Amino acid sequence: MSEPNSDAKAADAKARVRAAFETVTKAVSLQTHADGGKDPVAVTAVAANARLSMTAGSAYLLSRLDPATPPELAAAVRSLAELLEDIAMNSLAGVANEDAVQAARLRDAEAASVRVAEILK
């Protein structure tokens, strides 16, 4: 049986992760679905914001973990954060979303996001 204090700390840690996850999910969705139109500068800016949202989102999620975060949740968040970093860095390196390995990363990130959401229910 857990002590009430540790249960409260775990609940607080989970709430911090939930808030961060909701913010990151919104930011990544918003920035990766923006339309730069036909202007090459705008298209480049939209792509940069998409990559930034993933890189910053990864760091933001990881910064919200603490020792009281339930282990299953912490592992799922770390997995998602790593995938977001990998996607962003490979995009910056010129790897297209249609590349087989990058496409797999994108699918894995979606699955990891679903997993985090399930744990947070």
Regions found by a protein language model. Name each.
Residues M1-R16:
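N-terminal low-complexity, Pro/Thr-rich disordered segments
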